[in-house]
């Protein structure tokens, strides 16, 4: 998993609350078990005018030319609600997003995002609204996120602080997913196994 320390990128806005995981990645695209290839289906029902995904919806923010290449998503409260599908952060990350900023997240989505190297940032509703206004006002506006300092810097230079659990912060800074964390205990596991008595018939 790629370590996350600081990130500055183009921000895109989805000005909606209660965006659930079925909207993030609809159920018909969940047959794959690898993490790759989900980005094309991200927000499928909003991004496309047809079921096949051949006709992009020009009104949807992710399809607007000014937001192409965005790596930070701004949304409203309760982002990632609904089912616990891990495919949701897979799709967001595969699309190229590194940070989701919202006033609140569904708990399971929040944990899944961190476990997959995606940083969910909780700011107040007023701070998110300010970010949205600044991003909408200036084409190409970028937002900076510093996980070390736990700050978000708006296009105008305003700085907002956010909280994150120390363990989650440590894992993201060091690029540790569940497998990486387990490997860190390799020596301790090996030492324990040498102390286990052999099987006796």
Swiss-Prot record:
Entry GO terms, CC: 3-isopropylmalate dehydratase complex
GO biological processes: L-leucine biosynthetic process
Keyword Lyase: yes
Pathway(s) where this gene product acts: Amino-acid biosynthesis; L-leucine biosynthesis; L-leucine from 3-methyl-2-oxobutanoate: step 2/4
Enzyme class: lyase
Keyword set, alphabetical order: Amino-acid biosynthesis, Branched-chain amino acid biosynthesis, Leucine biosynthesis, Lyase
Name of the protein in question: 3-isopropylmalate dehydratase small subunit
């Amino acid at each position: 998993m790629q370590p996350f320390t600081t990130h500055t990128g183009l921000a895109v806005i989805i000005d909606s609350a209660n965006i659930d995981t079925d909207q993030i990645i609809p159920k018909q695209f969940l047959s794959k078990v690898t993490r790759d290839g989900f980005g094309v289906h991200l927000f499928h029902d909003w991004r496309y005018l047809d079921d096949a995904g051949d006709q992009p919806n020009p009104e949807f923010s992710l399809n607007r030319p000014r937001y192409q290449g965005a790596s930070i998503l701004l949304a409203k409260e309760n982002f990632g609600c609904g089912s616990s599908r891990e495919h949701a952060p897979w799709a967001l990350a595969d699309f190229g997003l590194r940070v989701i900023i919202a006033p609140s997240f569904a708990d399971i989505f929040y944990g899944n995002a961190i476990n997959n190297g995606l940083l969910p940032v909780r700011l107040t509703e007023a701070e998110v609204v300010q970010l949205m206004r600044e991003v909408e006002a200036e084409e190409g506006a970028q937002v900076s996120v510093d996980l070390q300092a736990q700050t978000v810097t708006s296009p105008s230079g305003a700085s907002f602080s956010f909280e994150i659990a120390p363990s989650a912060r440590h894992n993201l800074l060091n690029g540790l997913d569940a497998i990486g964390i387990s490997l860190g205990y390799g020596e301790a596991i090996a030492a324990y196994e040498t102390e286990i008595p052999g099987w006796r018939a």
